[in-house]
């Protein structure tokens, strides 16, 4: 019997090949798209969730009270405090980049990414040791000049033939400190934030922080820090206790301490991620909507096919078939199509995995992805069977009880609303994606045409390494296509503020007012050479520099932008004084502030991505190391100059050192809009897929519907109806469905688009024509899809139709 069901199922698959093809391909696309999105979300939110204590492990970060800036980590002395003074804490671990230039057996190792950790690190994040000391991979030593080191398999195989050969090797840094490899551990998984080449242990307890006052150590730069709480700890109470710990105990009056689950660390503290978590969630929800669109299409086509087979079911019933037999046949046919859709989905994944990894900047384990696809397929199969069987159960009941009237009665009373609802849902999802894609396109186009406020053309950004700074600035002058080297200091184009301060003072500043002010510390001629427009006063000049200034600042003249001038609330800010505290140069509270004279006001310019409003900004001279250099090139010589700069950096960078990151400013701007561009591609693709699935589905349904209604149309023509009236009647039906779908989907799309646009200070305004354009586009799309079928049916010969029946 089962064999007969399968044979009949494949026969019907071929008989209704167009509908079957649309069902299988559409379902395969929906299943694959949603599965990839779900896998991506699960992968990105499971970082380091595989460690035994991950459920109770939290990352510690701090917020500077002065600047409001979030900093990953905390002063290292907090780790000792947590281990000794907080009973809620099971383990507290800290780690930090070690730096260093290493050699081993006269072999240059270069600057691997080593991190020093405290003794709790391997308890909290136990590594998989593959060679060496299994029980204590990095024993702590009292002598800081001689430490033990555990390295990854990748690092060991880079310099030695086997992990075992690396054991016992001694690495010596530039200070003649040595590190002995005592263990080789397995490479960290790709979904882990711990990606160092090696780790060595140091002691971190309060006895190591007694030579100076606690306040001194609490002003140290932050280190990475993680805490594992006991199982029954009240996390909220612990968080409140930790939040103001340093302030209440007068250890650091400018430091708030916060915690976040380790699985959220990557996105909560990673401001420069290619994709934020909201985008990934949007991807998943969009994939789910596409899946529902394909499921609605599948259900519509399946139910329509079953009604087309009403005579077959009536004949089966008359020959003794019972409900069970009919249900089994339908279940087998749906199962065959879902299985074929899964096979197509597997093929799509195999073909597109490299492209998906590159596009989404992620790593894909195919075996896990295939399991997710199978689970999604089972979910879809269950949902399809439940809905289809529920819909047709009454139809089969009618066939059993009313041999003559059953099929036609059910068709006229139930099939129509099923068809209309299903088509409407598909069109609604399609309309939502089309509207969103339109808004995204307009917003991105506006962003690309927004002036940054400085000349971004023919400009190269270099994140310069300190090892090559002097030689680079000397030799860059010899490249003929480069006309100028601009000291950028801390200025860089990014999503996040790189340096902001709140404790900036000026005359008549409102009491208790707090403003986050961006500080640009760069070369004396930075604003002039970046071609930032001067509105009042003058630029900074060489004569403003004071080489003998005791604070080390070197210049007490500054420029401000329009936003900062508005805060000063004065008609002429030129000559006004502002004050600021600089804890790096002037110490802690109680030290007199630094005073600066405003000599010029420049036009507002974007130093951050266009997701951010232009902040009040102060430009001051920076007398220290430049993190960024900007190279101005001859017009049209940008690519040639970029190639020459990269060759220079490659030539002068010592062996083993990372190369300085170099790119054009316009390329950097493209990176900053990567999420927006990816969102546009996503919703455009979804709109196209939904439109195609809907078009094929509507075409198939309309073809079947016209075939079923040919007798009705013939009778109407005999009774005097013209072909034009029949065409208008049929098109009116589909137009009403389309209007209803737009009436529901467009307000939902508006709410989503408006919420998305709120993150941009300069955004497009949603106008009436945007709604009208989508409405007209969908009406035109539907009419063109069904018009051919309707015209053929309306122009048919009614006499032949009546005779054939």
Residue spans for each PLM region:
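Intracellular coupling helices
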Residues: 6-14, 18, 22, 26, ...
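Small-residue-rich transmembrane alpha-helices
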Residues: 32, 36, 258, 334-402, ...
């Amino acid at each position: 019997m089962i064999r007969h069901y399968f044979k009949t199922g494949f026969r019907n698959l071929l008989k209704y090949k167009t509908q079957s093809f649309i069902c299988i391909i559409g379902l395969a696309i929906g299943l694959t798209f949603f599965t990839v999105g779900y896998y991506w979300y699960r992968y990105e939110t499971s970082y380091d969730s595989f460690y035994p204590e991950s459920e109770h492990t939290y990352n510690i970060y701090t917020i500077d009270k002065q600047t409001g800036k979030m900093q990953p980590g905390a002063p290292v002395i907090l780790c000792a405090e947590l281990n000794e003074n907080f009973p809620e804490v099971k383990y507290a671990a800290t780690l930090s980049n070690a730096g260093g230039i290493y050699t081993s057996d006269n072999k240059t190792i270069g600057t691997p990414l080593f991190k020093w950790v405290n003794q709790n690190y391997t308890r909290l994040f136990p590594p998989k040791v593959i060679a060496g000391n299994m029980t204590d991979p990095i024993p702590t030593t009292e002598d800081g000049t001689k430490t033990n080191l555990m390295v990854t398999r990748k690092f060991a195989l880079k310099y030695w033939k086997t992990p075992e050969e690396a054991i016992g090797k001694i690495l010596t840094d530039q200070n003649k400190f040595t590190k002995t490899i005592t263990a080789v551990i397995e490479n960290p998984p790709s979904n882990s934030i711990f990606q160092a080449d090696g780790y060595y242990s140091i002691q971190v307890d309060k006895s190591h922080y007694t030579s100076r006052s606690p306040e001194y150590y609490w002003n140290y730069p932050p280190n990475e820090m993680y805490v594992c709480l006991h199982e029954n700890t009240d996390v909220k109470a612990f968080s409140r206790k930790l939040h103001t710990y340093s302030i209440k105990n007068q250890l650091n009056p400018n430091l708030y301490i916060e915690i976040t689950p380790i699985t959220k660390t990557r996105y909560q503290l990673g401001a420069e991620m290619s994709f934020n978590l909201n985008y990934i969630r949007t991807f998943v929800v969009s994939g789910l909507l596409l899946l529902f669109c394909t499921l609605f299409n599948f259900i519509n086509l399946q139910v329509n096919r079953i009604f087309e087979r009403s005579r077959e079911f009536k004949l089966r019933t008359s020959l003794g078939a019972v409900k069970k037999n009919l249900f089994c046949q339908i279940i087998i046919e749906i199962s065959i199509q879902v299985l074929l859709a899964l096979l197509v989905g597997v093929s799509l994944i195999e073909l597109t995995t490299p492209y998906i990894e590159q596009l989404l900047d992620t790593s894909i384990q195919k075996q896990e992805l295939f399991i997710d696809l199978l689970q999604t397929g089972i979910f879809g199969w269950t949902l399809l069977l439940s809905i289809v069987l529920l819909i047709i159960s009454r139809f089969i009941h009618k066939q059993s009880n009313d041999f003559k009237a059953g099929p036609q009665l059910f068709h006229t009373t139930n099939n129509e609303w099923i068809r209309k609802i299903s088509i409407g849902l598909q069109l609604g999802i399609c309309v939502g994606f089309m509207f969103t894609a339109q808004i995204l396109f307009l917003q991105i186009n506006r962003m690309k045409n927004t002036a940054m406020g400085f000349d971004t053309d023919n400009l190269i950004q270099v994140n310069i390494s300190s090892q090559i700074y002097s030689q680079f600035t000397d030799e860059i002058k010899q490249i003929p296509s480069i006309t100028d080297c601009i000291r950028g200091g801390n200025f860089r184009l990014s999503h996040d503020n790189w340096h902001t301060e709140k404790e900036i003072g000026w005359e008549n500043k409102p009491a208790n007012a707090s403003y986050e002010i961006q500080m640009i510390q760069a070369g004396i001629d930075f604003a002039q050479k970046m071609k930032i427009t001067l509105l009042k006063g003058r630029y900074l000049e060489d004569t403003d520099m004071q080489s003998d200034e005791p604070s080390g600042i070197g210049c007490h003249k500054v420029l401000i932008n329009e936003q900062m001038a508005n805060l000063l609330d004065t008609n002429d800010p030129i000559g006004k004084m502002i004050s600021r505290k600089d804890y790096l140069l002037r110490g802690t509270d109680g030290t007199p502030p630094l005073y600066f004279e405003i000599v010029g006001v420049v036009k507002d310019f974007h130093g951050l991505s266009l997701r951010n409003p232009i902040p009040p900004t102060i430009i001051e001279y920076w007398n220290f190391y430049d993190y960024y250099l900007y190279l101005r090139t001859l017009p049209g010589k940008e690519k040639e100059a970029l190639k020459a700069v990269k060759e220079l950096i490659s030539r002068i960078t010592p062996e083993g050192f990372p190369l300085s990151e170099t790119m054009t400013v316009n390329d950097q701007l493209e990176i900053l809009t990567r999420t927006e561009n990816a969102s546009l591609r996503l919703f455009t693709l979804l709109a196209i897929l939904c439109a195609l699935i809907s078009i094929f589905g509507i075409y198939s349904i309309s073809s079947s519907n016209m075939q079923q209604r040919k007798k009705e149309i013939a009778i109407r023509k005999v009774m005097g109806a013209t072909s034009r009236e029949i065409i208008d009647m049929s098109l009116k039906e589909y137009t009403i469905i389309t209007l209803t779908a737009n009436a529901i989907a467009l307000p939902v799309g508006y709410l989503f688009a408006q919420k998305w646009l709120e993150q941009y200070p300069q955004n497009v305004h949603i106008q009436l024509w945007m709604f009208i354009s989508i409405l007209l586009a969908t009406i035109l799309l539907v009419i063109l899809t069904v018009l051919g079928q309707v015209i053929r049916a309306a122009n048919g010969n009614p006499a032949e139709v009546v005779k054939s029946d």
